[in-house]
Amino acid sequence: MRVVIQRVSHASVTIDGHCKSAIQKGMMILVGIEETDSWEDIDWLCKKIVNLRIFDDENGVMNKSILEDEGNILVISQFTLHASTKKGNRPSYIKAAKPEISIPLYEQFCNDLSCALGKEVKTGEFGADMKVELLNDGPVTICIDTKNKE
């Protein structure tokens, strides 16, 4: 699994002209799933995300997790995170998992992340054409890939 985490002042996702979900202060997370991703990847990633210390403490130092900061999370499925640009100029998405694999993993990721956060995680709609709006705070943007657990 590959995620791009952005610390946001607010974020929202619109589908067919209607706001599907919106959050205030917290994280907007793009998540891409590939064929070899597993339930173990979800567990590791959820723990990593909720414990990332990317929120400012009283001294302005990034020393608080989203749990301590009581922030919200918006998760957006994003198969293009697995784009390969090795050949030519048109990205290939062959590494992205097919829906029969990615949908159950995406749903489990969102459920497990809600449990780890202790409140509902807002989402877009898997496979939909979405308009995502956010105000990046910092900016703080973190990329994590479960195939490269550093």
UniProtKB/Swiss-Prot annotation:
This protein's UniProt keywords: Cytoplasm, Hydrolase, RNA-binding, tRNA-binding
SUPFAM superfamilies in the record: DTD-like
Enzyme Commission number(s) of this protein: 3.1.1.96
Catalysed reactions, semicolon-separated: glycyl-tRNA(Ala) + H2O = tRNA(Ala) + glycine + H(+); a D-aminoacyl-tRNA + H2O = a tRNA + a D-alpha-amino acid + H(+)
HAMAP family: Deacylase_Dtd (MF_00518)
Keyword tRNA-binding among UniProt keywords: yes
PANTHER family: D-AMINOACYL-TRNA DEACYLASE 1, D-TYROSYL-TRNA TYR DEACYLASE
Motif mapping: Gly-cisPro motif, important for rejection of L-amino acids: 138-139
The name this protein goes by in its record: D-aminoacyl-tRNA deacylase
Subunit structure and binding partners: Homodimer.
GO CC, alphabetical: cytoplasm
Top-rank taxon: Bacteria
Swiss-Prot/TrEMBL domain comment: A Gly-cisPro motif from one monomer fits into the active site of the other monomer to allow specific chiral rejection of L-amino acids.
The protein's role, per its UniProt record: An aminoacyl-tRNA editing enzyme that deacylates mischarged D-aminoacyl-tRNAs. Also deacylates mischarged glycyl-tRNA(Ala), protecting cells against glycine mischarging by AlaRS. Acts via tRNA-based rather than protein-based catalysis; rejects L-amino acids rather than detecting D-amino acids in the active site. By recycling D-aminoacyl-tRNA to D-amino acids and free tRNA molecules, this enzyme counteracts the toxicity associated with the formation of D-aminoacyl-tRNA entities in vivo and helps enforce protein L-homochirality.
Principal EC category: hydrolase
InterPro entries with a match to the protein in the record: Daa-tRNA_deacyls_DTD, DTD-like_sf
One record GO biological process: D-amino acid catabolic process
Protein encoded by which gene: dtd
Subcellular location: Cytoplasm
Source species of the chain: Bacteroides fragilis (strain ATCC 25285 / DSM 2151 / CCUG 4856 / JCM 11019 / LMG 10263 / NCTC 9343 / Onslow / VPI 2553 / EN-2)
Single GO molecular function: D-tyrosyl-tRNA(Tyr) deacylase activity
Family: Belongs to the DTD family.
